From Swiss-Prot:
SUPFAM superfamilies: Nucleic acid-binding proteins, Translation proteins SH3-like domain. Belongs to the universal ribosomal protein uL2 family. It comes from Methylocella silvestris (strain DSM 15510 / CIP 108128 / LMG 27833 / NCIMB 13906 / BL2). GO terms for cellular component: large ribosomal subunit. This is Large ribosomal subunit protein uL2. The gene is rplB. Residues 202-279 are annotated as: Disordered.
Length: 279
């Protein structure tokens, strides 16, 4: 997929750069693999805002994606590649030899008519799923499970990938895009290839209204607010906030470490922070 630019007929078109999706399927999604989805507007079950600057946006239908890929040793044919409003990557509709259909995350270099399979031992080609232990060192993978049978949790965004870099006592070492290297159990499934739509990162929204279509409301900085609304608020004229950056609730932000999950730290071989310092 390439990027699409426009003649600057209006100021917003001058800035606009979008992904050319002309090659994607243009019809509606498969009805039995969709379900309704209600917008929360950033509110929780008490009706209170838990995520700021969310709301509005176009109504979306949720596509049920098969992240587990546990239908083993049954070949499936790619029927079409589709747009999915719920994620940055594209999705592929596949039909198994027994007639069952499902959606999977579409990897790069997967085309209509290709065959994919999920197996304990499969060919190393885009779209095939297998345990990490079955993959050769150096394989590019995505949609990686963190717990056996739970379904892919990591590396699902547009253009992302991880690489198998080693093995260690039943575990496999993978290198993530962040530079982090971590141990994952060898029986956890992953899919071969990098996620589709790598040009997503180069797209430019072009105008405020397009952000609203996506359900994003205006994002206000703390220094533009009043003291009642934010610790950085107030002051005569434009001020810098007068203190280290904090959240609206006074917690340090911009670099403050917040990771509290100590139980899985042992699986991190190389921290993403240390890998960046070396580079």
């Amino acid at each position: 997929m390439a990027l699409k630019t426009f003649n600057p007929v209006t100021p917003s078109l001058r800035q606009l750069v979008i992904v050319d999706r002309s090659d994607l399927y243009k019809g509606k999604p498969l009805k039995q693999l969709t379900e309704g989805k209600s917008s929360s507007g950033g509110r929780n079950n008490n009706g209170r805002i838990t995520v700021r600057f969310r709301g509005g946006g176009h109504k979306q239908t949720y596509r049920i994606i098969d992240f587990k890929r546990r239908k083993l040793d049954v070949a499936a044919k790619v029927e079409r590649i589709e747009y999915d409003p719920n994620r940055t990557s594209f999705i592929a509709l596949i039909r198994y030899a027994d007639g069952e259909q499902s959606y999977i995350i579409a990897p790069q270099r997967l085309s209509v008519g290709d065959e994919v399979v999920s197996s304990q031992q499969a060919d190393v080609k885009p779209g095939n799923a297998m345990p990490l232990a079955s993959m050769p060192v150096g394989t590019i993978v995505h949609n990686i499970e963190m717990k056996i049978g739970k379904g892919g949790a990591m590396v699902r965004s547009a253009g992302t990938f991880a690489q198998v870099v080693g093995r260690d006592q039943g575990y496999v070492i993978i290198r993530l895009n962040s530079g982090e290297q971590r141990l994952i159990h060898g029986q956890c499934f992953a899919t071969v290839g990098a996620v589709s739509n790598p040009d997503h990162m180069n797209a430019s929204i072009g105008k405020a209204g397009r952000s609203r279509w996506l359900g994003r409301r205006p994002h206000n900085r703390g220094v533009t607010m009043n003291p009642v609304d934010h610790p950085h608020g107030g002051g005569e004229g434009r001020t810098s906030g007068g203190r280290h950056p904090v959240t609206p609730w006074g917690k340090p932000t911009k670099g403050k470490k917040t990771r509290s999950n100590k139980s899985t730290t042992k699986f991190i071989v190389t921290s993403r922070h240390k890998s960046k310092k070396k580079g």
